[in-house]
């Protein structure tokens, strides 16, 4: 992998589970963990990666198809987990198990954080969850935007998608 690139791999999508892997030379990030820990490990193996190498999990919202394996992975591998305050409270009510305080981090909507060699912007979306958010990943003038589980695409989100070099947009309805 070159210093100016990043890899995006969709591990799972849909009501049975969601997980997306994003890798840069310095960071290995999982967005959502809606499969069991074993299933995430198997999906990572399929793309030639190890679940043990993931250093960060970003959570979009607390629905089980986005957080099913988060507690297991956090306890087994010690990964840092980022979510906004309302999502953390909602996840804890869903009994994700004990996660060490030093692994829990806040990432509120509208904030940009730098993770090694990649900047990540969080943004609010419309969905039936405590405080759903999704992410835009920016590295070396390139931008990838993730947008799933949203009921409405605002003008701000539309502009973000329009200006992205690539984006992932999930569309499904039961």
Where are these regions (language model features)?
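Structured catalytic core of nucleotide-sugar glycosyltransferases
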Residues: 9-19, 56-70, 74-75, 88-92, ...
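Short amphipathic alpha-helix with an adjacent loop that forms part of the alpha/beta core around
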Residues: 44-48, 113-117, 157-160
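Active-site-proximal loop/helix segment associated with metal-binding centers of metalloenzymes
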Residues: 119-174
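Conserved beta-strand hairpin/beta-sheet module of binuclear metal-dependent hydrolase folds
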Residues: 1-47, 133-149
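Short, well-ordered alpha-helix to beta-strand connector turns
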Residues: 54, 101, 164-165
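Active-site neighborhood of phospho(di)ester-bond hydrolases with catalytic His/Asp-centered motifs
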Residues: 31-34, 54-62, 82-85, 145-149, ...
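Metallo-beta-lactamase
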Residues: 85-134, 138-141
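Active-site metal-binding motif and surrounding structural segment of the metallo-beta-lactamase
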Residues: 38-83
């Amino acid at each position: 992998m070159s210093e100016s690139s990043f890899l995006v791999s969709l591990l799972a999508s849909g009501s049975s589970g969601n997980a997306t892997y994003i890798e840069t030379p310095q960071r290995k990030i999982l967005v959502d963990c809606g499969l069991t820990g074993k299933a995430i490990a198997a999906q990572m193996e399929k793309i030639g990666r190890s679940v043990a190498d993931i250093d960060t999990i970003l959570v979009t919202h607390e629905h089980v198809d986005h957080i099913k394996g988060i507690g297991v992975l956090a306890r087994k591998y010690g990964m840092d987990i980022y979510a906004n305050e309302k999502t953390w409270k909602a996840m804890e009510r869903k009994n994700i198990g004990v996660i060490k305080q030093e692994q829990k981090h806040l990432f509120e909507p509208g904030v940009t954080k730098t993770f090694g060699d990649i900047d990540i912007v969080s943004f609010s979306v419309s969905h039936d969850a405590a405080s759903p958010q999704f992410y835009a990943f920016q590295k070396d003038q390139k931008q990838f935007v993730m947008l799933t589980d949203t009921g409405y695409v605002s003008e701000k989100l539309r502009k973000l998608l329009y200006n992205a070099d690539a984006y992932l947009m999930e569309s499904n309805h039961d």
